[in-house]
Amino acid sequence: MLSKRIIPCLDVRAGRLTKGVKFEGNVDIGDPVATARRYYEEGADEIVFYDITASHEDRGIFLDVVERVASEIFIPFSVGGGINTVDDMRAVLMAGAEKVSVNSGAVKTPDIISQGAAAFGSQAIVVGMDVKQVEKSATIPSGYEIVIHGGRKYMGMDAIEWAKTCESLGAGELCVNSIDADGTKDGYELTLTRMISDAVTIPVIASGGAGSPEHMYDALTRGGASAALIASIVHYGTYTIPDLKRRISGMGAKMRMVW
């Protein structure tokens, strides 16, 4: 059985670490470079960096911050935000990331997934999915709709079907973020996570809502996720990563205790 992963997420705006609830009310909470280094030293399995306004502002990612983070950590590092072309992917990988996370850019131009996989390998391509629960319809039979531009634009695309498409185009991993749960610390959207993990064969990262080790354990077991993305739960000092790993391991999930 493969070890489950704990992945701290750094949402970055204007070069600073920030956090909101349901993509709103973001507040400055520190330096992303120092925070990434701390999580690496605590034993995080991976770090995810999102430039959360790059797509909405139609600009490139903050490569200088990516380079600074990459120079401080020695674990897998995934970067997303404003990635719309293979050249954007290359720039992020050259700045020190092991993986690129495409979200809005992939929805608008799905071929970027296959182009990126051909150029850099599927293992380097993560598709981020921002999802809202809506009324079920012929267009959205699952009741989960894809949204882009930081939750600002509904796309009329069913999340489960989009997940299958991403896998068929060559994505190596999916990061599934429930906007309804994001930042609430009330638990992951387990129905959504399970539906997607059952629909694809590639790893699924659960994102949005972690407030306790029990929430994370549920996502990694009942939700079928291979990894749990976390933010508020560690950013605000509620738990350390070693605390979380010990607690989740004690519940029966296989964790990598030391990197």
From Swiss-Prot:
SUPFAM superfamilies: Ribulose-phoshate binding barrel (SSF51366). The active site is at D11, D130. It is found in: Cytoplasm. InterPro entries: Aldolase_TIM (IPR013785), His_biosynth (IPR006062), HisF (IPR004651), IGPS_HisA/HisF (IPR050064), RibuloseP-bd_barrel (IPR011060). One of its GO terms (cellular component) is cytoplasm. Keywords: Amino-acid biosynthesis, Cytoplasm, Histidine biosynthesis, Lyase. It is an enzyme of class 4 (lyase). Pathway: Amino-acid biosynthesis; L-histidine biosynthesis; L-histidine from 5-phospho-alpha-D-ribose 1-diphosphate: step 5/9. One of its GO terms (biological process) is L-histidine biosynthetic process. Pfam families: His_biosynth. Its main location: cytoplasm. It catalyses: 5-[(5-phospho-1-deoxy-D-ribulos-1-ylimino)methylamino]-1-(5-phospho-beta-D-ribosyl)imidazole-4-carboxamide + L-glutamine = D-erythro-1-(imidazol-4-yl)glycerol 3-phosphate + 5-amino-1-(5-phospho-beta-D-ribosyl)imidazole-4-carboxamide + L-glutamate + H(+). Its EC number is 4.3.2.10. Belongs to the HisA/HisF family. Heterodimer of HisH and HisF. IGPS catalyzes the conversion of PRFAR and glutamine to IGP, AICAR and glutamate. The HisF subunit catalyzes the cyclization activity that produces IGP and AICAR from PRFAR using the ammonia provided by the HisH subunit. This is Imidazole glycerol phosphate synthase subunit HisF. It comes from Nitratidesulfovibrio vulgaris (strain ATCC 29579 / DSM 644 / CCUG 34227 / NCIMB 8303 / VKM B-1760 / Hildenborough) (Desulfovibrio vulgaris). The gene is hisF.
